[in-house]
Regions:
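Conserved acidic
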Residues: 1-317
């Protein structure tokens, strides 16, 4: 049994947490039923409140993806474009310079445009280079495209950060990827799913014949102003603590809260629950993905495609 000083430590640890929780509940008018379970839960609640300011739930619901569009968005989603230059990997290189884009994801959430209308399927007869170009340059559309590429090859064989990742491609034929840690240098044929932003980067880096297999378009606009204001507020909280001696822990916490605004957008709306049984056994919920998406859409206050475009904009920066 726990006794003496160890028991006293455990008791005071719990009492301290109880006092902290009581202080938080008094500050925010919460009860044990309403208090967020995590620190990012506060950000989620504030973001929900912001989205209620002139943004009707029906608007968000009207632009949420159906199941087929959702699957394409999942295929297109990827994170930052981080990669080691294959010509220098493993070497010690001196007299180099570097640059860092501060708060990249919050920056694009405030400054860039996103798909703000329902995704509409592109008719098969319009899946051609001229129509896609008009959508991008004249009609100012956000595009979600399943494409194939024949005779793919880097324009510059010395380029150190090839954009296409084997993990995000399918139906790959005769590809050279082993020389660059999973990035594709060339291929006889492959298929992938991209946004219009990714398409621009691919066309800048590679040559090859692009075949448009399937696509959707949406209209570009800025994110809702109340949501942008919420991002700015958390960014201000973070920057006021940056470099302040003795505030390092609070700075890291403020930074995590700021980044969680992006995390809410990029969270997969289709999540299977794990059901724990007796004796350590567990089962995975077998509810169909389409049904889970429908349930998620009914309570969503942010659109999943916004998260997909946040990282796409950042990769293009």
């Amino acid at each position: 049994p726990i006794e003496g000083e160890e028991l006293e430590y455990c008791v005071n640890d719990v009492l301290g947490l109880v006092e902290a929780i009581q202080a938080l509940m008094e500050r925010d008018g919460d009860t044990l039923q309403t208090i967020p379970l995590t620190s990012t839960g506060y950000v989620r609640r504030n973001a929900k409140r912001a989205m209620r300011e002139g943004i009707h739930h029906n608007f968000v619901y009207s632009i949420l993806p159906d199941f087929e569009t959702y699957k394409a968005l999942r295929e297109a989603f990827r994170g930052g474009n981080t990669h080691a230059n294959r010509y220098y990997a493993g070497d010690i290189v001196e007299n180099v310079h570097s640059a860092d884009r501060s708060s990249s994801y919050p920056a694009v959430m405030c400054n860039c445009e996103f798909p703000m209308t329902e995704f509409v399927p592109i008719l098969p007869k319009d899946l051609n280079k001229d129509y896609i170009a008009r959508c991008i340059t004249i009609r100012h559309k956000a595009l979600l495209l399943r494409i194939g590429i024949k005779d793919l090859k880097l324009r510059d064989s010395f380029w150190g950060c090839p954009y296409l990742s084997k993990d995000k491609c399918r139906n790959i034929h005769k590809a050279i990827d082993t020389e660059d840690n999973g990035r594709i240098l060339e291929a006889e044929y492959l298929e992938t799913t991209v946004t219009d932003i990714d398409l621009k980067i691919i066309m800048e880096e590679y040559t090859g014949q692009i075949i448009f297999l399937q696509g959707w378009y949406s209209s570009y606009k800025k994110l809702p102003e109340p949501l942008i204001n919420e991002v700015v507020k958390y960014y201000k909280d973070k920057t006021e603590l940056k470099g302040v001696k003795g505030q390092e822990i609070f700075y890291d916490k403020a930074k995590a809260l700021l980044n969680s605004l992006y995390g809410m957008m990029a969270q997969d709306p289709v999540k299977h629950s794990l059901i724990f049984r007796q004796f350590g056994d567990w089962d995975e919920d077998d509810t169909p993905d389409e049904e889970l998406l429908g349930k998620s859409n009914k309570r969503a206050f942010l659109a999943y495609q916004w998260g997909v475009w946040v990282t796409a904009h950042s990769r293009d920066a």
